[in-house]
Amino acid sequence: MRDEAIRILRHMGFALADGPEIEDEFHCFDALNTPEDHPARNEKDTFYFDSGKLLRTHTSTVQIRSMEKQTPPVRVISPGSAYRRDEIDATHLSAFNQLEGLYVDTDVSVGDLKGTLEYFLRALFGSDTEVRFRPHFFPFTEPSFEIDVKLKVDGQEPRWVEIAGCGMVDPNVFEAVDRELGLEPGVQARYTGLTGFAFGIGLDRLAMIRWGIRDIRALIENDMRFLAQFQ
């Protein structure tokens, strides 16, 4: 699933980017416009080390690091592991796999965002796949959307299934990156004033939907009877 998603997005012009799994609060939260009182920053939700470092809760951290290293335009995807203090059950793991993407340039629009993700999801699930965008909230994007696709699940009639989150990058994110680079937004800015979109997809959830896997724990239990189906 991971390789197929990467192949499609690379064909669309996205470059692979990577970053550390042990992160700091700036790259995981502050730069992503996440306020100090946000529940995601609580020790009940995030794995913190005594040093103050943490296990990244999403691969959006790589988007910030990519902007720090590159000059616009930026078009990257960052597949990798993320970690949260979730109670492990049929749909949740404390360590899971994500794929996130970022595109930043001049005059990037919501239409670009929707067109990109519709193309990607139809390449993944079939050209006739129905896709819809629902308004949502994320701290680091505005406007924000959740994406549903209409699929047959467990042999039942087609129904809407939540598949990803996305949105237009909040201007506060660009300003945070510029300040970290020592650039004054609006004066020497590298990113302030540009536009862009970001998206995030759970690869484990994609695999569960694609192959009708009912329990996410099957992906990590190394049961050969299960794994043999995918050779």
What function would you assign to each model-found segment?
Residues 1-231:
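TRNA-recognition modules of translation machinery and tRNA-sensing kinases, especially anticodon-binding
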